[in-house]
Amino acid sequence: GGPFIAYLATSRQIFQDIYDAGDMFAIYFAMGSISAGAASLLNARLVMRHGMRRLSFIAMTTLTLISALLWGWTEFVGHPGFILFMVWQTSFIFCIGMIFGNVQSLAMEPLGHVAGLAAAIFGAVSTLVSLPLSWLVSGYFDNSIAPLVAGFAIAGAMSLALMRWARRA
């Protein structure tokens, strides 16, 4: 969640300062956001056939890989063009749409008898973890998308490691 909050915090600067989007910011932002709705609809169709764990793992792996690739691009090739950024934005938001609902449901699965309390605790803990990560990623914003995509790649890799650990536990 931390890099996603950092994206929300820096998106206006990215679109207006880096890509000179001007008044089109809201439209470009919305274009990327539509993919979260598409992910929810697709998830509803696939979850019974493939399961929450598998869909979450595939989405997290995809999010991590596309972010690592774009991070590498920014470091070795230079600033990506607007179209490439939009493809990444739409893709990572789609992945987030697949991940959040499934992971929250998986976390709540064994706690059905105290679901309300568990939801409140999970919400508080995820906020307490996300905000410092968001602050860290946002703090490195330097009129480049590199810190943001690096944050997604690193947090994604850490999340994949935690998913593997949780599966074995």
Residue ranges of predicted features:
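Residue-level signature of mid-helix packing/kink "hotspots" within the transmembrane helices
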Residues: 33-41, 131
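Transmembrane alpha-helical cores of Major Facilitator Superfamily
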Residues: 30, 34, 90, 120-128
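Helix-to-loop junctions at the C-terminal end of transmembrane segments
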Residues: 39-54
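A late C-terminal transmembrane helix in Major Facilitator Superfamily
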Residues: 104-142, 151-152
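C-terminal transmembrane helical hairpin of 12-TM major facilitator-type secondary transporters
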Residues: 54-103
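Multi-pass alpha-helical transporter architecture, strongest
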Residues: 153-169
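Juxtamembrane helix-start elements in MFS-like secondary transporters
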Residues: 21-29, 81, 85, 144
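Extracytoplasmic gate region of multi-pass secondary transporters
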Residues: 1-29, 35
